[in-house]
């Protein structure tokens, strides 16, 4: 078959599609333009376009496929099996809490098969466990670009966003995940945690988040932040919930006696009692005993708030 006959058959096939196909008017116009462009480009005369030549072209192609079947790429099949093996090893590493090893294994699986949404979702879970939340967001979004209905990816995205302080985005992610998996308890708990954070006053949330970050890094909490950065009077101190809560804990734990044995603290107290004015709060904030006490106080408060660490992390697939 000459090239002109093939071209003419293609034009006939397009014209048949226009008249017999269930296509919209806009699509018909596009096919008409395409057929005319091909005819003009190859200088095909109208009499060269034989009726039903398009059908014969399709039949010839189908016959060729029967005689020359496309063989499955065995190498690709083997590679996918290797990627699945790496994924399973990564899942085992997650179960053993070896998150860095899991991350490395998922990365190798992605290098072999970058089209699997599950690998990105699982690596997002590993990133979350390692505290690399920006990377977790990126992997979760990549997974969702490959599979928009992947509920677990929404959970991992929600946890990363919540850990980054974006409670609104976290709540949105958890809600979308629940649209596809309404009975998922992890997503439900994650949404509850995100809504709880959204309902907290913004200033106290920011202060709490900063204090937790400093405490988790091993640094002393900022005692000065309790006083709002200024030098308060005694009345405002007594009305400050954070100060009163700390005072109650001091008295209940018996730690107040240890503090008063510190010569610097005792001297400040005597000076205040004798009319020497308010003590230097900057010095108080830098006192090692007070810093250590505040750190322990904050850690005790945080012990009851560990649910967020488990949000969005069901077992990997």
Curated annotation (Swiss-Prot):
Q: What is its main location?
A: cytoplasm
- Membrane-crossing ranges are none
* Polar residues bias spans: 198-215
Sample GO molecular function, one term: molecular adaptor activity
Q: Where in the cell is it found?
A: Cytoplasm; Nucleus
Q: Which superkingdom?
A: Eukaryota
Sorted alphabetically, which keywords does the UniProt record give? Answer: Chaperone, Cytoplasm, Nucleus, Repeat, TPR repeat
A Pfam family: SGTA_dimer
Q: Which Gene3D superfamilies match?
A: Immunoglobulin FC, subunit C, Tetratricopeptide repeat domain
Q: Where is this region: Disordered?
A: 198-224, 298-317
Q: Which InterPro entries is this protein grouped with?
A: SGT, SGTA_dimer, TPR-like_helical_dom_sf, TPR_rpt
The residues bearing each TPR repeat, given as ranges, are: 14-48, 83-116, 118-150, 151-184
One cellular-component annotation, GO: cytosol
Q: Name one GO biological process term.
A: post-translational protein targeting to endoplasmic reticulum membrane
Residues folding into a coiled coil are: none
Tell me the function of this protein. Answer: Co-chaperone that binds to the molecular chaperone Hsp70 and regulates Hsp70 ATPase activity.
Q: Which family does it belong to?
A: Belongs to the SGT family.
Name of the protein = Small glutamine-rich tetratricopeptide repeat-containing protein 2
Species this protein is from: Schizosaccharomyces pombe (strain 972 / ATCC 24843) (Fission yeast)
């Amino acid at each position: 078959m000459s090239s002109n006959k093939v071209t003419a058959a293609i034009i006939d096939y397009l014209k048949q599609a226009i008249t017999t196909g269930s296509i919209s008017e806009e699509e018909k116009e596009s096919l008409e333009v395409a057929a005319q462009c091909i005819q003009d480009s190859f200088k095909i005369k109208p009499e060269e376009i034989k009726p039903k030549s398009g059908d014969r072209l399709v039949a010839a192609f189908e016959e060729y496929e029967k005689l020359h079947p496309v063989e499955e790429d065995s190498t690709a099949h083997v590679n996918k099996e290797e990627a699945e093996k790496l994924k399973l090893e990564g899942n085992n590493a997650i179960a053993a809490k070896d998150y860095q090893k899991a991350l490395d294994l998922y990365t190798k699986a992605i290098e072999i098969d970058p089209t699997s949404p599950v690998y990105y979702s699982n690596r997002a879970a590993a990133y979350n466990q390692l505290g690399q939340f920006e990377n977790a967001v990126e992997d979760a979004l990549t997974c969702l670009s490959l599979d928009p209905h992947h509920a677990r990816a929404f959970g991992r995205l929600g946890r990363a966003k919540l850990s980054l302080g974006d409670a609104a985005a976290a709540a949105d992610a958890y809600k979308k995940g629940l649209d596809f998996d309404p009975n998922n308890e992890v997503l439900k708990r994650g949404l509850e945690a995100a809504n709880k954070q959204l309902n907290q006053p913004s200033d106290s949330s920011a202060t709490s988040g900063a204090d937790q970050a400093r405490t988790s890094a091993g640094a002393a909490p900022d005692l000065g932040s309790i006083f709002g950065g200024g030098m308060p009077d005694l009345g405002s101190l007594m009305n400050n919930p954070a100060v009163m809560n700390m005072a109650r804990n001091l008295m209940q734990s018996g730690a107040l006696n240890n503090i008063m044995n510190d010569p610097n603290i005792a001297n400040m107290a005597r000076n205040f009692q004798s009319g020497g004015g308010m003590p230097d709060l900057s010095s108080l904030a830098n006192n090692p005993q007070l810093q250590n006490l505040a750190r322990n106080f904050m850690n005790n408060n945080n012990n009851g708030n560990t649910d967020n660490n488990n949000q969005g992390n069901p077992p990997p697939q």
